[in-house]
Amino acid sequence: GEQDVVSTILQADMDRLRHTNEHLAREAFSGAVEALLQARCIYVLGVRSSAALASSLSYYLHYMFETVRLITTPSTSEVFEQLVRISPQDAVIGISFPRYSTATGKALQYCREAGAQVIALTDSETAPIARSAHYLLTAKSDMVSLVDSLVAPMSVVNALIVALTSRRKHETAQTLERLEQVWDQYHVYEKVHI
């Protein structure tokens, strides 16, 4: 029944999280954090189901860094149009899980050849984008009938955000303070009095 589906999926996701925790290379994770901290511009690339992960990462990076570019178009030509100015002062994090996007693979190869720091978040060392990565972050992801399980990859994204936030406390606090003022002034959010 439906209860069994819930238990089965949640248990499988817990297993994926455990596997990811045991196999994620901590040196690569630390290197990725440093590369992002040093970058002039951060490009975040993820298409199809990986676009959700890229969007979430990009959303939080905007609180910490001035120049963040999110690329989620599945069009290979548009991906290259958005990456054409990447330089050795920049970093890109590409996210790709099966079925692997050829656009993401080609784009990361281009970024590496352009001298940028390349971070790849994918499911294994043999994934197509792994070849272009300076820093390879792996997270277990399996197809569950129609859907990809992105729980473990999202957890790695969350860990990156927390690690970066702890290193950019001042910048993040300043941004949030300014945003709170703007939100109040322009009534962006409803205030609920309890």
Task: Outline where the language-model segments fall.
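A short, charged, Gly/Pro-tolerant segment at domain boundaries
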Residues: 170-194
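Glycine-rich phosphate-binding loops that contact phosphosugars or nucleotide phosphates
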Residues: 40-155, 159-168
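Short, charged beta->alpha transition segments
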Residues: 4, 27-32, 78-81
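Glycine-rich phosphate/diphosphate-binding loops that line cofactor/substrate pockets in enzymes
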Residues: 27-40, 86
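HTH-adjacent hinge/linker in prokaryotic transcriptional regulators
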Residues: 1-27
